[in-house]
Amino acid sequence: MSSGETFRPTADFHPSLWRNHFLKGASDFKTVDHTATQERHEALKEEVRRMITDAEDKPVQKLRLIDEVQRLGVAYHFEKEIEDAIQKLCPIYIDSNRADLHTVSLHFRLLRQQGIKISCDVFEKFKDDEGRFKSSLINDVQGMLSLYEAAYMAVRGEHILDEAIAFTTTHLKSLVAQDHVTPKLAEQINHALYRPLRKTLPRLEARYFMSMINSTSDHLYNKTLLNFAKLDFNILLELHKEELNELTKWWKDLDFTTKLPYARDRLVELYFWDLGTYFEPQYAFGRKIMTQLNYILSIIDDTYDAYGTLEELSLFTEAVQRWNIEAVDMLPEYMKLIYRTLLDAFNEIEEDMAKQGRSHCVRYAKEENQKVIGAYSVQAKWFSEGYVPTIEEYMPIALTSCAYTFVITNSFLGMGDFATKEVFEWISNNPKVVKAASVICRLMDDMQGHEFEQKRGHVASAIECYTKQHGVSKEEAIKMFEEEVANAWKDINEELMMKPTVVARPLLGTILNLARAIDFIYKEDDGYTHSYLIKDQIASVLGDHVPF
């Protein structure tokens, strides 16, 4: 590079895998009578509702039905019925010495998922005199799977559930490795071991569970429920594709792909991320604004990480803090486009929110956006100076720059009356559940993305900060951060079982889903940057209809 050239640490990100895939032409809009479909949907829904409210004298059957309704992704239709059923099931079976491992585990998990902090002492009866889980349990594969799933509902200090994860993981892996289970059961075990239900995105689990039921001859699965779930999934699929069609038009009009070629072009991946946050039809507005704001922030992130000079970035940071269109004149040409797009997006959201009488909420998202970009600026300076901070100095800045408080705030903008002014004040004070989601985001991102980022030139991640400060290996640092992530999950579990909850349960469920999205994206690699790694899963929930 000649002395007159400007150094830009570009990353050579791969292009969009989807581009205009979801863009509809005039010929795609056909006049279809949806009346018959809706009538069938309503009829099946009422049948399922009756199933949930009936069979009061069959609690084990009721437990299984509720579990299937939730895993198939249709529980949002029956929230009151499920809540009533769970409350009635609270005192049943847990204290009974006759209840088997599967029943106790399923009951425990369903109650905790509903926010009821039932004691983990219910599993003590499955231990032997030496305090270990009984060896006889190893042959109860269904019970072992249920215990494994239940154990991920743990909070800090529940050592019996930590032991349960270790016990079930070891023996379930052994059963598969030694071919002691059928191929179908082995596939179910591997699916659970790779990602437990607590960490699974609802749409992906629904799609998997439908396929799993389809391929089994188990007559216990309810065909009415399955058909309702398939129909509901397909109806929502059309809605989600239409949302992506509109977002693709917005993306195409921006033409960032041509004008800002250094940045990751990940519109569909971001929509999928936001679909993981909430998929229900009433949150269509939320998905739209989340995708738009997160797409713009992703462009800004890459501008700070992979293109802008320190002088340019300082100007952009100042412009964002001013938040005034007049500040655009101080920016270089390529940044003017980004800045105008950012302000335009917020202005449009403010207008839409004004129609709901909630425009006052938008300022919280603006403030979080400013905090994120301020953190980007600090990290850009660190990189420019070759500075590696201590982990104590790094984490407060990095927890802001991971932008999950901003993302959570954006998601709440789309949740209507649940998200009051008091809720946004609560978020801005960084409560435990929000911090836990940010810890999961930052540390998983750093653990999976740091090698790619360091090769191209990037601010030090948590890995580099910790290894330099403490003189330990990368492997030791990762092990410690994995424990921190596990504890953050336990903090989320604890907050979702607080009585009374500080904010409405749907809001807490959104934070849980955002943590799940991180686990999906960053479990083995940086699936957002290298998005070909998650293309098949995106296609599974945004592709073809589920066949009947």
From Swiss-Prot:
Q: How and how many cofactors are bound, per the record note? A: Binds 3 Mg(2+) or Mn(2+) ions per subunit.
Induction (record text): Induced by ethylene.
Ligand binding (Mg(2+) 1) = 301, 305
Q: What is its EC number?
A: 4.2.3.73
Pathway(s) of this molecule: Secondary metabolite biosynthesis; terpenoid biosynthesis
Query: What InterPro entries is this protein classified in?
Result: Isoprenoid_synthase_dom_sf (IPR008949), Terpene_cyclase-like_1_C (IPR034741), Terpene_cyclase_plant_C1 (IPR044814), Terpene_synth_N (IPR001906), Terpene_synth_N_sf (IPR036965), Terpene_synthase-like (IPR050148), Terpene_synthase_metal-bd (IPR005630), Terpenoid_cyclase/PrenylTrfase (IPR008930)
CDD domains for the chain: Terpene_cyclase_plant_C1 (cd00684)
Q: Give one Pfam family.
A: Terpene_synth
Determine if Magnesium is one of this entry's keywords: yes
Q: MF terms per GO, please?
A: magnesium ion binding; terpene synthase activity; valencene synthase activity
Per the UniProt entry, the signal peptide is: none
Question: Which positions in this protein are listed as binding Mg(2+) 2?
Answer: 301, 305
What is catalyzed by this enzyme? (2E,6E)-farnesyl diphosphate = (+)-valencene + diphosphate
Q: Which Gene3D superfamilies match?
A: Farnesyl Diphosphate Synthase, Terpene synthase, N-terminal domain
Entry's free-text remark on domains: The Asp-Asp-Xaa-Xaa-Asp/Glu (DDXXD/E) motif is important for the catalytic activity, presumably through binding to Mg(2+).
Q: What is this protein called?
A: Terpene synthase 1
Q: Which species?
A: Citrus sinensis (Sweet orange)
Quote the gene name from the UniProt entry: TPS1
